[in-house]
Amino acid sequence: MGLQRDALRGRVAVVTGSTRGLGLAMARQLGRQGATVVVASRSAGDVEAAVEQLRSEGVAASGRRCDTGELADVEALRDEALGLGTLDIWVNNAGASGVFGPTASTPADDFTRVVRTNILGTFHGSRVALPVFLGQGHGDLVNVYGHGDQGPVALQNAYASSKRWVRQFTETLRLESKDTGVRVHGLNPGLVMTDMLGHVTSQPGYEHRLRGLQVVVGLWGQSPDDAARPLLALVTSDTAEFRDLTKTTMVTRGVRNVLAGRLRRANRMPLDVTVLDTR
């Protein structure tokens, strides 16, 4: 059974990293179900453009520039939502991918950048939202997982390990929030065709290993709008988590995408690989 129209009417939802790609699609999905959405990213211009776009689509939207690695920014984002009357849903979506290549030669500043966004940003969002939720006796916190959340991934250690951390962090929050009325969810959207996936930086000598990425995305990738839909089921139920790429979906989507011609070169996702200059 589908959701009743306007199932989120009267609720206020914050989505971090939401001025494009998956985050914007999540904000749109929530807004179409009646929620007032607060979008955020590190670019004030991008926030303004996203708010304007959502409003043109009939979504009640507000926004604020926010670097999730800065606690003060995240607190201000929370206050932006509370200024609209309430805070009911918080989605920690902001994420960063690292330079492709072995950990032994990964630039320290790049590893730190990924950890700052994926780990510290998720903690900050959870830290400011949960006290509000616990105080009012309800609320939905959603943390976004990713490739590596269930095991090691060679040559993507910063990103994969950070997502493994997000999974354990989320499962711990769920234990701590038991019987409080607060629901904590995890969402692994699978392969989403976004700018982050289509623009990759590689260490020298490893760029050739990315040649198959377009084929993988052609088989199992999906649009941001499709990837965002399961969010609605999470925030309207007690479901703990959603994982897109199960064995079943890999078979069914793979067959469907092959038949749809997604593996043809003309239909593949554009891929831009930048080789890191180590000179």
PLM feature segments, named:
Residues S126-R127, E171:
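A short, exposed helix-loop element centered on a Lys and neighboring polar residues
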Residues V12, T19-R20:
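Conserved glycine-rich cofactor-binding loop
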